[in-house]
Design a protein with these regions (language model features):
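Helix-coil modules at protein/domain termini and other flexible surface or pore-lining loops
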Residues: 1-188
Length: 188
C-alpha cells in the first residue's frame, strides 16, 4: 500500500483534561473521527497533495488512517507551544521525499516551521547526494538545494498556541494519507 494522495492539516485544543484537549485539537484539524496510526517520515513517490477540504471528504468515520503527526501540549500559563510538519519534494516525482515532524516550547510558528522544512530538506538532500553546509542559515541552504535541481519544493504546516491557566493546550500538525480505496477512480 503506497498512498497517492495526502493532505496537510493542523489544530489546537484547550480543555481542563489532557486527553480532551488532544481530542479538541483533532476536531480542530478535522480528523477526530478517524483511528490515526502514526508512521515514519517518507513522502511516497508520485503522491499528490490535495486541499484539506477534499481530503477530509475522502475519509470515513472509524477508518484506520495513516499519518505523520507532530503534537505538543502544555498546562503552563502563557507557555508557547508549537507543532509542525515539514515536507521536501524531489524534482523526480518517481522517487520518495521526506516529511519531518517537530514539537517545541518557546518557538514561534516561523521558527518551528522553518526548522521542520529545513530538516525535511536536509534528509532528502543527503539521500540525493546534494552537498551542503549544515551551519549556514536555512534560507541559504534552501537556495543550494533548489539550485542543485534535485529538490523542487519545500513547505510546512505549523500550529502554535499559548497555554491557558488551569487548562491543557494541545497543538497538532499532520500529514494525512488518504486510503487508496477511498479515492474515486477519475481522481487517481
Amino acid at each position: 500500500m503506497v498512498p497517492t494522495q495526502m493532505f496537510l492539516t493542523r489544530g489546537v485544543g484547550v480543555h481542563k483534561e489532557k486527553l480532551a484537549s488532544f481530542e479538541q485539537a483533532l476536531r480542530s484539524a478535522g480528523v477526530a473521527y478517524c483511528n490515526l496510526v502514526t508512521v515514519s517520515s517518507i513522502y511516497p513517490p508520485n503522491c499528490k497533495i490535495v486541499p484539506r477540504a477534499r481530503g477530509e471528504k475522502l475519509l470515513n468515520p472509524g477508518e484506520i488512517t495513516f499519518c505523520v503527526m507532530a503534537r505538543s501540549e502544555t498546562n503552563e500559563r502563557n507557555r508557547l507551544t508549537s507543532a509542525s510538519i515539514g515536507l521536501a519534494v524531489p524534482t523526480d516525482r518517481r522517487t520518495y521525499g521526506y516529511l519531518s515532524e517537530h514539537h517545541a516550547h518557546g518557538e514561534t510558528d516561523e521558527e518551528t516551521g522553518e526548522y521542520t522544512e529545513d530538516l525535511a530538506a536536509q534528509m532528502l538532500a543527503t539521500t540525493l547526494g546534494v552537498e551542503f553546509d549544515p551551519n549556514i542559515a536555512w534560507k541559504e541552504r534552501e537556495q543550494v538545494f533548489k539550485m542543485a535541481g534535485k529538490i523542487v519544493r519545500t513547505l510546512n504546516i505549523t500550529q502554535s498556541a499559548i497555554g491557558k491557566p488551569n487548562r491543557w493546550t494541545t497543538v497538532i500538525a499532520l500529514a494525512v494519507f488518504i486510503p487508496e480505496e477511498n479515492i474515486p477512480k477519475r481522481r487517481r
